[in-house]
Structures are given as C-alpha cells and as structure tokens.
A protein has these predicted regions:
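Iron-sulfur cluster-binding cysteine motifs and their immediate structural context
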Residues: 2-42, 46-61
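Iron-sulfur-associated redox domains of electron-transfer enzymes in respiratory
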Residues: 60-185
Length: 185
C-alpha cells in the first residue's frame, strides 16, 4: 500500500510532537529522526497538522497528470465546501474547479444520496449483518478500525465508497455525453 504521508528527514528535529499525537502509534524516533511505521499508519494527516518543523507532508499526484486525459472531471467531496468561511454559494467552488481546467464537475454529494438509498434497502433486506454498520467512506477510519479495532471490521458496510461510486457514475455519463472511451476520461 502506498501511503500519502511522508517525512522530510532534513527538516525533522526529533521533537516527538508527531509521536504524541498519532492515533495509531505509527511513528517512532530512530537516530534522532521520526520514522513512520507503514503497517500502522492510517494516513489521517494528524502528524502533518501538528509538526512544528513542517517535516511531514502529504504526497499527491502532480496536477499535470490531468493532461494525460482528453476529458477531465473534478469530483469534489461535500467536505470541501466546509474549507471556506462564509461560503453562501457552492457554485463559486464548482466554477473555480472549472477555471482550474477541468472539463466537468460532478458533485460527490449526488453519489452519496444514491448510495445511501441503496445501502438503506440492503440493510433492510440483510438483517443478519452486524449492527451498527460503519460507512467505508473515509479510508483513514477504515484503516484505523483494521489496526486498532479489528473486531469492528465486519461492521464496515460492504459497499463501495461514495467517491468510487461518483467516479464510476461520472465516467459512465461522460462516455455517453462525449463519445470518448473510458480510458480518455
């Protein structure tokens, strides 16, 4: 598994702030520098937020990778809107994504609504599932459960995440609308 959290050893001072705040105890200090234990890290980003030396950062794909596709779709999570103070109109964010160069914006919230309806029907039909069910929507929570609370693994709903569903739905619609192959989207 490729992790999204990495350490810059040149910036690390071995202060242990990240260690004290890691919910899964995935960080150790070795030779005066922090080291992330990949089998315990859940990629929650707590260490990124608390490091006073900015030695922990998140790895993400380069924006230029979008140029490999003929048609690009942004799929903003509903949590994105909460990052802006006094946001009265989500269209401001959606239009901003288009201005960044995306060809289309598909709101993940639409997929969330469709998926929650499906999940509700499934829960009613499958009464033998352990309750309460836990949404698989947050990968950090799923990894936290698998590391710290393995007895709850069978409580994770056996459905794809809203983000995955949104990506599938958006791509299928774009194929219909544009005539492009799925590989081009």
């Amino acid at each position: 598994m490729r992790h999204s959290v990495v350490l810059d050893f040149k910036k690390c001072r071995g202060c242990t702030t990240c260690i004290k705040n890691c919910p899964t105890e995935a960080i150790r200090v070795r030779s005066g520098k922090a080291t992330i234990l990949p089998n315990r890290c859940i990629d929650c980003g707590t260490c990124i937020r608390v490091c006073p030396h900015k030695a922990v950062k998140s790895v993400c794909d380069d924006f230029s990778a979008l140029k490999n596709y003929r048609y690009t779709i942004a799929i903003p999570d509903p949590a994105l809107y909460g990052q802006f103070q006094n946001l009265d109109d989500v269209d401001i964010v959606l239009n901003g994504l288009l201005e960044l160069g995306f060809d289309h914006v598909y709101e993940a919230s639409a997929a969330c609504e469709m998926l929650s309806g499906f999940a509700r029907e499934r829960i009613l039909k499958e009464s033998d599932r352990p309750m309460p069910e836990i949404s698989p929507a947050c990968p950090a929570v799923v990894r936290l459960i698998s590391i710290r609370f393995p007895k709850l693994i069978n409580h994770i709903a056996p459905v794809i995440t809203p983000s995955e569903f949104a990506a599938i739905t958006a791509r299928q619609q774009a194929v219909k609308d544009t005539g492009l192959s799925p590989d081009e989207i």
